[in-house]
Amino acid sequence: MSKHAEAVTLRLAQPDEHKALEELQRRASLELDDYREQLLANPDAIHLPPSQIANGQVIVAELHGEIAGFAALVGGELDGLFVEPDLWGGGIGRALIDAAAHEARRKGLALTVTANPTARGFYESCGFTFEGETPTRFGPGLRMSR
């Protein structure tokens, strides 16, 4: 196991965590070069729909009582995966993906994602297969499945 994964607790997000989750999403999104300029110019693009939390579609990773990351799963689509940047490489993202994959399988679905180019190696290391490029709001995204 990775350095943080064994200490992580996974649970569903609560409505009162919406703002904290969006702030985490903003920090993680702006850490990468892929779409930083577009995201800074279009702050509305960093958004976690409250309905995803209300519908039980957001899995939170907690480390020592603090939110360390989250995954949003809509059907079989990994709609978002965000981990605090200073915790990257510690196994939290992988733990969230495993939980999302388990939930998708429980529904009889494959887990799919439209990833940013920087994340391709990470997703491949988590068992995803590249299927091709797809257009996104800010440029090509990578369609992957597991």
Regions found by a protein language model. Give the residues of each.
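Conserved N-terminal entry element of GNAT/NAT acetyltransferase domains
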Residues: 1-16
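Conserved GNAT-fold acetyl-CoA-binding loop/helix
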Residues: 18, 22-48
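Conserved beta-strand in the GNAT
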Residues: 60, 66-82
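Conserved active-site alpha-helix within GNAT-family acetyltransferase domains
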Residues: 94, 116-141
